């Protein structure tokens, strides 16, 4: 729908927004494509750090906007550019009145890494509600997946801004997508409400 490189390019305040954050190559673009039912809405890449802007996608007939944020933890770009992306992301998180939730995507194969935990702390300090969502759940066995979810749940108990009930998804196999869509739908404008 729209790509934003600076705060002055943000769209006018409209429907509620849910942002997707996560380490580079965690599968944000693949998850967006699966949610939208399109393979080409968000560009996927094996190169970490490909997303360098805030990318807006319309979901549920325009009743909710998804915002794909630049990945953290890796970026093959000059330091000044990485710092500019970081400023954009944090300014967006602090100041966007329609931002309702940040879905913090975590690779199910590895669980929460140090930089994921730092982002959880940052979101808690900014009082931005967040929901951890494991990606690539099809690549781990059920026992390991349950253990990862339990580890995250324990950590969430210490985070005031965290929503209970971390989720597990697989963009490739479709596992968990219906439950995730239902969770997102709770933030959408009611059916028939005026949209900008």
What residues fall within each predicted segment?
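Conserved G1/Walker A P-loop phosphate-binding module
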Residues: 1-76, 186-195
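Canonical P-loop GTPase G-domain recognition
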Residues: 1-7, 139-196
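Switch II of P-loop NTPase G domains
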Residues: 9-13, 48-55, 64, 70-100, ...
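Short, glycine/charged-enriched secondary-structure capping and boundary segments
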Residues: 14-15, 35, 79-82, 117-121, ...
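Hydrophobic packing within well-folded, soluble alpha/beta domains
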Residues: 31, 102-103, 180
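Residue-level signal for inorganic ion chemistry
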Residues: 57, 135, 180
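Conserved C-terminal guanine-recognition region of P-loop GTPase G domains, centered on the G4
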Residues: 87-164
